[in-house]
Design a protein with these regions (language model features):
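NAD(P)H-binding glycine-rich loop region in Rossmannoid oxidoreductase-like domains
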Residues: 2-35
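Short alpha-helical oligomerization interface
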Residues: 24-39, 71-79
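Short-chain dehydrogenase/reductase
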Residues: 33, 79-88, 122-129, 158-159, ...
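Active-site Tyr-X1-5-Lys
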Residues: 65, 80-111, 133-137
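C-terminal substrate-binding subdomain of Rossmann-fold SDR/epimerase-dehydratase oxidoreductases
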Residues: 137-213
Length: 213
């Protein structure tokens, strides 16, 4: 529709581009790049042409294992799957336009987002959502055993509530002078054990089981 000029005469202030193929197990590179790179590129050039603010979803997966840190700079970036590569590829493409762009381009690197309305996400739903479903189905929560120096359930992630993500998006909408790539997380990591124990405490019963990785 954008390529056909359907939106050329519309008065749009901002585009929040949150759509993507987010399946980290997807190995079809052509499919992933069409959805996560080519479509986003089309949106960006439309926004630049019309001087519309563009705030798009990048991903903390662009940091890989995190062994290089989590700063928004190339030295920390290491895509480990097709999804992460597609996100990083567009981030690097967008970087070429930041300085000369006459309208806002912002990429938000979401960490582990959780919250309501995750039913449609299947295996890509948040760990918290999956733990709740495990308890409802089996009365217990399962976590992976330790690996790569981590103890049982001691793997860590930065979990951010979806409504806080919305607030961050709106912050950048209110500050059109800002451009670039920004992390979108809490800045604090929590273990899977902490989450699992919180779920069990909420329900008031159940057990925690560790399974081989």
């Amino acid at each position: 529709a954008i390529k056909n000029g359907k939106f050329d005469d519309t008065n749009i202030e901002v585009i929040f581009h949150e759509g993507a193929c987010s399946d980290t197990m997807e190995y079809n590179g052509k499919y992933m790049m069409e959805n996560n790179f080519e479509y986003t590129k089309t949106l960006m050039h439309f926004a630049l042409k019309k001087k519309i603010q563009l705030i798009y979803a990048s991903s903390a997966s662009t940091y890989g294992s995190g062994k290089h840190g989590f700063s928004e700079k190339p030295a920390c970036e290491e895509a480990l799957n097709v999804y992460a590569f597609s996100k990083l590829f567009f981030d690097n493409y967008a970087r070429r336009y930041f300085d000369a762009a006459e309208s806002q381009i912002v990429g938000l690197r979401y960490f582990n987002v959780y919250g309501p309305q995750e039913n449609h996400k299947g295996k890509m739903a948040s760990m918290i959502f999956q733990m709740f479903n495990q308890w409802k189905a089996e009365g217990k929560v399962k976590l992976f055993e330790g690996i790569d120096g981590y103890g049982n359930g001691e793997q860590v992630r930065d979990f951010i509530y979806v409504k806080d993500v919305v607030k961050v998006n709106f912050f950048f909408w209110d500050h059109p002078e800002l451009k670039g790539i920004y992390n979108c997380g809490t800045g604090h990591a929590h273990t899977f054990n902490t989450l699992a124990k919180g779920v069990l405490k909420y329900f008031g019963s159940g057990e925690l089981e560790y399974v081989p990785f």
